[in-house]
A protein has these predicted regions:
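A short, structural motif
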Residues: 1-73, 80-92, 103-111, 123-131, ...
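EAAAR-patterned alpha-helical heptad-repeat segments
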Residues: 111-118
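Conserved catalytic-loop aspartate of Hanks-type protein kinases
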Residues: 134
């Protein structure tokens, strides 16, 4: 932590706080060293608190079943999403807090979930509202009521391919768009 405080814009105290979140996520020392660079780069680029950024990254990586060494890639995805949508890293982190456990369990990619959250942010649905809404939609489609299933069948909406494997999130969105696109208000 002291070395990072001396060689980056973050203080040793900031670095220690970030590492505390990593430790709470169960990261070992090697994991912390693998992950800290991506987390610091994201926090610096987004002008966000290092501890908060570490919490966002560690929680999301855990939910998606990713490794500490994936933190740089995840940071890049979040930075791109926040740069291309009406949101920021902190709000995306709030969204991920709610949707990541469900999306990760359904094997959806960080990229697809970030894209969906960015689109929602552009429609003024942000932070915990976006995360909760997306989580609820995914959970409902994964285990629909009989009435929901009847409507999904009627409009050709499915989360799975013919062989039972999950469709990608992008395929689900395209499926929703084509199935519901002709409906009027």
């Amino acid at each position: 932590a002291e070395e990072m405080g001396a060689t980056t814009k973050f203080t040793a105290s900031d670095s220690a706080e970030a590492m505390n979140y990593m430790a709470m996520a169960g990261w070992k020392t090697e994991d912390m060293l693998d992950g800290i660079t991506g987390i610091m780069q994201l926090a610096a680029a987004a002008n966000e608190d290092l501890g908060t950024t570490s919490d966002i990254v560690t929680d999301a990586l855990t939910a998606f079943g990713l490794k500490a060494s994936d933190s740089g890639h995840f940071a890049d995805v979040l930075a791109q999403a926040s740069a291309n949508a009406n949101t920021n890293v902190s709000m995306l982190g709030e969204s991920f807090k709610y949707v990541a456990p469900v999306a990760g369990a359904m094997k959806y990619s960080v990229e697809d979930v970030s894209l969906a959250l960015g689109l929602m942010a552009n429609a003024s649905i942000k932070a915990e509202v976006a995360g909760t809404s997306l989580k609820t939609a995914l959970a409902n489609m994964a285990k629909p009521t009989k009435q929901m299933q009847a409507y999904m069948d009627k409009y050709g909406i499915s989360l799975t391919n013919a062989d039972g494997s999950m469709k990608t999130f992008r395929e689900v969105i395209d499926n929703l768009r084509s199935g519901l696109g002709g409906l009027s208000k």
